[in-house]
């Protein structure tokens, strides 16, 4: 059991590093795609989604959030997962071939200005390429949620969201994060709901910490606070931080400046400079 737990912990850390490596380009692609979805819905258009296997579940997940709700009660918006109807997909697959299961539906349901969202881990599925060609023929916009360069599908899309290449499971986990972020952008644009929930990790300024605290309070998040010099980090510090983190939903740790530590502890302190103390604290799992 312990060996298995260690392996799982390693996997979780690898996933965290993968998420941390996502840069500003991915963020910009998500923002642009979210605005495209919002514009389509605002113009009374419809969003169609398609994908295979695990990506099919992403399609239905996105549609459930759009038609139902993501964060707040609101009227439903128009979206259809082309993967959802087993009778339809098997009928088309039987009569026209599996390569046409999505394209046939795109031509039937899509109109100029509508949007088709194609989820794929490889970018090379023939039925998704055919769906893109069908969308082009009826003057729909095409958004690909892909990995790496997007494969062959990447060349057929008007917009791309490109997560890092990796295992199928890792890509699908990234796609899940992406679809939730897309829903945030859509609701923010169409309903004026602030992007959130607020997620902060690492070193922030006092003003940023105050803004986070206000945002968390509005969301009903309980926040703990502790502070200190943390010049020579020891077991007592770790126990205090662990206790503080366990007492609330989030923890903010205040850190004395170098000049403050010097006034409190003498000219020979701090031993560890402020920036390094901050990074050390931020690396702890309890903070």
Q: Model-found features: residue ranges?
A:
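Glycine/serine-rich anion-binding loops at beta->alpha junctions
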Residues: 45-63, 228-243
């Amino acid at each position: 059991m312990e060996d298995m737990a260690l392996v799982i912990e390693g996997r979780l850390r690898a996933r965290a590093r993968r998420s941390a490596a996502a840069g500003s380009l991915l963020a910009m692609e998500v923002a642009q795609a979210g605005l495209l979805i919002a514009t389509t819905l605002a113009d009374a258009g419809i969003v169609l989604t398609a994908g295979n296997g695990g990506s099919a579940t992403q399609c239905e997940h996105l549609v459930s959030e759009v038609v139902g709700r993501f964060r707040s009660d609101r009227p439903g918006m128009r979206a259809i997962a082309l993967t959802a109807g087993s009778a339809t997909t098997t009928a088309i697959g039987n009569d026209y071939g599996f390569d046409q299961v999505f394209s046939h539906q795109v031509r039937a349901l899509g109109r100029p200005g509508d949007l088709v969202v194609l989820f794929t881990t490889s970018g090379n599925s023939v039925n998704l390429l055919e769906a893109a060609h069908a969308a082009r023929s009826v003057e729909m916009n095409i958004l690909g949620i892909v990995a790496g360069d997007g494969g062959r599908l990447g060349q057929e899309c008007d917009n791309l969201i490109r997560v890092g290449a990796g295992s199928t499971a890792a890509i699908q986990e990234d796609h899940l994060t992406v679809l939730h972020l897309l829903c945030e952008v859509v609701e923010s644009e169409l309903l004026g709901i602030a992007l959130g929930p607020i997620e902060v990790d690492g070193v922030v300024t006092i003003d940023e910490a105050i803004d986070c605290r206000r945002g968390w309070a509005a969301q009903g998040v309980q926040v703990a606070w502790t502070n200190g010099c943390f010049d020579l980090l020891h077991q007592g510090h770790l126990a205090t931080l662990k206790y503080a983190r366990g007492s609330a939903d989030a923890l903010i740790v205040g850190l004395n400046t170098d000049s403050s530590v010097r006034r409190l502890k003498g000219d020979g302190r701090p031993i560890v400079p402020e920036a390094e103390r901050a990074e050390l604290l931020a690396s702890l799992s309890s903070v």
